[in-house]
Amino acid sequence: YYYWELLEDSHLKWENGMYRMDMDAFRELIKGCKLFILCNPHNPGGVVWKEEELREIAEICDKEGVLVFSDEIHADLTLPPHRHRPFATISEKARMNSITFMSPSKAFNMPGMTASHVLIFNPALRQRFRKFMEACELDLGHAFAFLSVEAAYSHGTEWLDQCLAYIQGNIDYVDAFLKEHAPKIKVVRPQASYLIWLDCREMEMSQEALNKFFVDKAHLALNDGAMFG
């Protein structure tokens, strides 16, 4: 029951100041797999995947018979001028060979509503998913969740626009502060979401020493980058 032993990590590559998918490695790793979990946009890297990247993923997964789970919970937090492209809209193959998971919980700060939703366009997959949800009694939901989702998506545009502008301001502030006070720590500017990935390689410190530096010197308890690979 240690599920991570069944996983293959598809590592990203560093390219022009941003993480990108290593398609050559992906083609090899995907062979023999049954399922690919896509984080779109990527968390914590903040990458909004390009259409050509998503199209290539769709082609490879269709060829290898691999179902795609597309986690798009950060989609509503895509920062201008970037545009999020839902995986299922890339092609008919992507549409019929994927399950998309979304929720307003990240963008509208409402995880307590347990108001996620799933998009399945393939009728056979949808039926299998429904049977699984019913068997596990996970299909019940509650009325308040439905109302909160409707309110967020119907009346939350102005609030979300202001939220994105505020997030962008935070990113600009952190970037400017580090350039002035800690130039060896580089901000990987996210294209989506409120998470900022800090490149500390120029610090030339071990992971343990780096964690100690942030806690003892900077007085910041941050998520250790090593946990993300």
Indicate where each model-derived feature is located.
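Structural signature of PLP-dependent enzymes
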Residues: 127-134, 152-175
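Conserved glycine-rich beta-strand-loop-beta hairpin in the small C-terminal domain of fold type I
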Residues: 143-146, 150, 166-175, 187-200
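Conserved C-terminal alpha-helix-loop-beta "cap" of PLP-dependent enzymes
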Residues: 184-186, 198-229
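Active-site phosphate-binding strand-loop segment of PLP-dependent enzymes
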Residues: 8-80
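Helix C-cap/helix->beta junction micro-motif
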Residues: 63-64, 94, 218
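Active-site PLP attachment segment
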Residues: 90-128
